[in-house]
Amino acid sequence: MKLGIVGLPNVGKSTLFNSLTKAGAESANYPFCTIDPNVGVVTVPDHRLDVLGEMYNTKKITPAAIEFVDIAGLVKGASKGEGLGNQFLANIREVDAIVHVVRCFENTNIVHVDGSIDPLRDIETINLELIFSDLEVLERRISKTVKLSRNDKMAAKELDLQNRLKAHLEENKMAKSFVTEDEDEQAWLAEYNLLTAKPVIFAANVSEDDLADDGVNNAGVQAVREYAKEEDCEVFVVCAEIEEEISQLDDDEKSMFLEDLGLEESGLEKLIKASYHLLGLISYLTAGEPEVRAWTIKKGTKAPQAAGKIHTDFERGFIRAEVVSYDDLMACGTHAAAKEKGLVRLEGKEYVVQDGDIIVFRFNV
């Protein structure tokens, strides 16, 4: 999974990225200190892996991973070349979802590019830049499709879609709110890889004082929550400065620090939950002495396709899957005991893999 972190200059975007990835990306109180995208990979915390590692006396534990891309700060007119221009747009097209850091804190020492704190205005600024960029992409496609449509029925059908989509974007609407039931049109939309079609998670960056109550008394946070609900986005509240402090601590110190702040989980854990929920992701597990590993798949994935995450041969030559749920295995204590109780199942090609399934795939190529 690849997430792009975006936001206006000086909203705490790079500070948050630093704390999430401990990559030490330069962060300073002036616009565009992140000129090239910084990339960091973080592991997804999953207590089940450690438990299985002990049970199987495993030599290696490999958690799922998320790749974060810190993309240079935006200003109005970025799609037309203002600020850093289109540099950020190419980088963001490759991500699975966008994490939009929104400033919901007051601090006279940190300037805001528009001179005041207004989360919804900031969201609109970035949305418009993404829309303008998508319109440019669409207009280039339309110019090609027009020529083809004169002698090609499918091209004519695609041109009709492109014109409807263009009108939709010109009303300052995001591509993800454009609805079509037609399978051809759905395939074309996916091919366009439009920025405004990507899922969005808002990171409401607050001061330490607003962290313990999850921003309930912060008007900016509440405004972002209402907006996100309307737009079918996820929101989590974070204090980037606190996250940066947390990133310097070991696990025991981190737990004590969070407890002192009245928090149950870190911002990273909130973000991972939000991204898994928004993208409809789950993890299945493989376990044995050589390695215990988590594999990330979409909800609804069938066994052969889940096997393909490990290797294409597993999917191509899939025979069956030997499955036991994590909870059943824990209740029984050992794989052998779970097998005795009939809790280890043999599943075929139509089996839909569940979160926490521990699977051994049988295949032949």
Model segments located where?
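Flexible interhelical turns and helix-capping residues at alpha-helix boundaries
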Residues: P9, I131-D134, N193
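Glycine-rich, flexible loop/turn motifs
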Residues: A23-P31, N38-G40, R48-V51, K80, ...
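Phosphate-binding glycine-rich loops and adjacent basic patches that engage nucleotide phosphates
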Residues: G12-F17, P45-N57, G85-N109, R121-L130, ...
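Amphipathic alpha-helical transducer elements in NTP-driven molecular machines
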Residues: F32, D46-L49, T62-F68, E82-D96, ...
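C-terminal-of-GTPase-core extension/linker across diverse P-loop GTPases
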Residues: K2-V6, F17, K144-V352, I359, ...
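Conserved Switch II/interswitch segment of TRAFAC-class P-loop GTPases
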Residues: G40-P45, A72-E82, R93-A155, H168-D182, ...
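Short, intrinsically disordered, mixed-charge
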Residues: K22, E54, A90, L128, ...
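Conserved G1/Walker A P-loop phosphate-binding module
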Residues: M1-V111, E139-R140
